[in-house]
Amino acid sequence: MPDNPTGTLPEIILASASPRRRQILSEMGFVFSVCPSQAELYPDGSVAPAEFAVLNAQIKAKDIASKYSNGLIIAADTIVVDDFGILGKPSSKKVALNYLSRLGGKPHTVISSVCLLNAENGQIRSATCQSTLTMRPYTQAEAQRYVDSGLPMDKAGAYGIQDKEFNPAENIQGCYLNVVGLPACTLVRLINEMGFNPKLARNWKPEGDCTLCRIYRTEISRLR
């Protein structure tokens, strides 16, 4: 993290339709517009999961950057990885139930890649964040009710850590916001690396127990 990033943030464009990512950015104090990217890769096993997430985030950022002459594009891609491979967003309720059956009572990895692209000069930065999550041993009936609610259908791995009624997680190691879909610690680090000073909301408190999120929150407050 630079000792004193002084650049003023340009207009921020979020290349995602995710309501969770919008909420995280808003709570952090960022003002931004939303222009979701439809560009997306589908896993075929040809690259490692972390590399796949990076490529997907970069493709989304470049897709939206082509529509703007200036502005800072923020794109992200989140995947769930178990012993058998990548679990993206389920294509059907049957697939969602299969994902939940695979994950129940077991640990898995959540990887989020964040990509920032300055549309004015083409500067680009990417980084990934990984968390390990163990699901609680929910029953098949619980999983079916959750799937029938429709809540998991737009989420990687067919669950949302923030879905309190289903409450899927038993234990989380790493960044909570990474599991939600946008690790604040990774985002702030990338913004700093691009030379900008992110002025975070004074009342923002990162959810979860991520040490890096809390450190960045403290450091940014000190630099204001």
Swiss-Prot record:
It is found in: Cytoplasm. The record marks R20, T78, Q162 as: Important for substrate specificity. It catalyses: dTTP + H2O = dTMP + diphosphate + H(+); UTP + H2O = UMP + diphosphate + H(+). It comes from the Bacteria. Its EC number is 3.6.1.9. InterPro entries: ITPase-like_fam (IPR029001), Maf-like (IPR003697). GO terms for biological process: nucleotide metabolic process. Disulfide bonds: none annotated. One of its GO terms (cellular component) is cytoplasm. Keywords: Cytoplasm, Hydrolase, Nucleotide metabolism. Its main location: cytoplasm. GO terms for molecular function: dTTP diphosphatase activity; UTP diphosphatase activity. Its cofactor is a divalent metal cation. The active site is at D77 (proton acceptor). Belongs to the Maf family. YhdE subfamily. Nucleoside triphosphate pyrophosphatase that hydrolyzes dTTP and UTP. May have a dual role in cell division arrest and in preventing the incorporation of modified nucleotides into cellular nucleic acids. NCBIfam families: maf. This is dTTP/UTP pyrophosphatase. It comes from Dehalococcoides mccartyi (strain CBDB1). The lineage of its organism: Bacteria, Bacillati, Chloroflexota, Dehalococcoidia, Dehalococcoidales.
